[in-house]
């Protein structure tokens, strides 16, 4: 295709398979989000005491999350009111830390079903996931294709 020819279509390079779809430059904050889990209809919640779980109540102040691009396709997830970062520990537990560590970075990937997945950068076979009960699902029990790992980012402005 001739570049700039009348009626031509500009083709953009394909996105890498690292989940880098539409990533912002490092340090850029997107608007706060709520992460809605397809499994059980829970919103991911980061509590001030460091616990992580899911809740169905849209007005819960602890479901407002700040996703920050750390590098292409990699985000940290911070609870706005808890002021803590989502982390995955070496045993697969999800909890929230006051300071971001290597355990707080996740590969954000838009899946073909338009849900996002958040895979630990440090423990790369493990995903952020919620069970049908609203409890988090430990990393070693997660994997591709599970409903528990699918999250729909929704605006938290309202």
From Swiss-Prot:
The yes or no answer to whether the keyword Nucleus is present is yes
Q: Which InterPro entries match?
A: Fibroblast_GF_fam (IPR002209), IL1/FGF (IPR008996)
Q: Where does heparin bind?
A: 39
Show the GO MF annotations.
fibroblast growth factor receptor binding; growth factor activity; heparin binding; integrin binding
Q: A Pfam family this protein belongs to?
A: FGF
**What SUPFAM superfamilies is this protein classified in?**
Cytokine
Spell out the SMART domains in the cross-references.
FGF (SM00442)
Q: Give start-end of the signal peptide.
A: none
**UniProt keyword terms in alphabetical order:** Angiogenesis, Developmental protein, Differentiation, Growth factor, Heparin-binding, Mitogen, Nucleus, Secreted
Q: Where is this site: Important for interaction with integrin?
A: 131-132, 137
GO-annotated cellular components: cytoplasm; cytosol; extracellular space; nucleolus; nucleus
Q: Region Heparin-binding: start and end of each range?
A: 131-147
Q: State the protein's purpose.
A: Acts as a ligand for FGFR1, FGFR2, FGFR3 and FGFR4. Also acts as an integrin ligand which is required for FGF2 signaling. Plays an important role in the regulation of cell survival, cell division, cell differentiation and cell migration. Functions as a potent mitogen in vitro. Can induce angiogenesis.
Q: Which family does it belong to?
A: Belongs to the heparin-binding growth factors family.
Q: In its UniProt entry, what is this protein called?
A: Fibroblast growth factor 2
């Amino acid at each position: 295709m001739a570049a700039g020819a009348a009626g031509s279509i500009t083709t953009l390079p394909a996105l890498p398979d690292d989940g880098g779809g539409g990533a912002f430059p490092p340090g850029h904050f997107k608007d706060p989000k709520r992460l809605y889990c397809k499994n059980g209809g829970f919103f991911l919640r980061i509590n001030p005491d460091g616990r992580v779980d899911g809740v169905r109540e849209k007005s819960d102040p602890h479901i407002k999350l700040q996703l920050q691009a750390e590098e292409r396709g990699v985000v940290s997830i911070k609870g706005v009111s808890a002021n803590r970062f989502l982390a995955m520990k070496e045993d697969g537990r999800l909890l929230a830390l006051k300071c971001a560590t290597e355990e707080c970075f996740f590969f954000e990937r838009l899946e073909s079903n338009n849900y996002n997945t958040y895979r630990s950068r440090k423990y790369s076979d493990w995903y952020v996931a919620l069970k049908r009960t609203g409890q988090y699902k430990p990393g070693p029990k997660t994997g591709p294709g599970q409903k528990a790992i699918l999250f729909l980012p929704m605006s938290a402005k309202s």
